[in-house]
């Protein structure tokens, strides 16, 4: 047992979403436990402890579920359940979009670039969260891509998941007029730029701070810190 292992109650929820009752040599629960272990500790796949399934099998499912949308389906189902538990409707009506550039290691990282604004060599993760800070969509790309044109990919991924009530995304000034027009025409989605107070000193941007908090949550896991 590791601190990252799924509890019985958590696995029961995920098992219902996966709806897969086939007998396997390695259970899907143990596979997900291995993925969570890698995410939290940041270890290499080949360095997985011996009491977890073979790393090749774990990576196979991680890669397969990334490509076939299983991770997105799991995330959406869990987001909807969490929102209902908080007394909200399953589908959000407002989201917050932002990006974060992070440094990468020298080896094994495709699509790297240099973010001239943040002075960071690495990749940029573009995310959309709801007003609870729950992640709705993610796209990762080279850090040298500007927020406005690359945001189309994350907006398209977000809308493809079928959040029917979504009407507005809150953003910073990096998201230009062309992007806002495109989102309105393509998805009838309003992208509203939330301005920071003009007074001297530090001021929290209304609602936009929630996406920054989500980035901070990500940093709790070593695999997501780079």
Language model: regions and residue ranges:
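Short alpha-helical elements
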Residues: 1-226
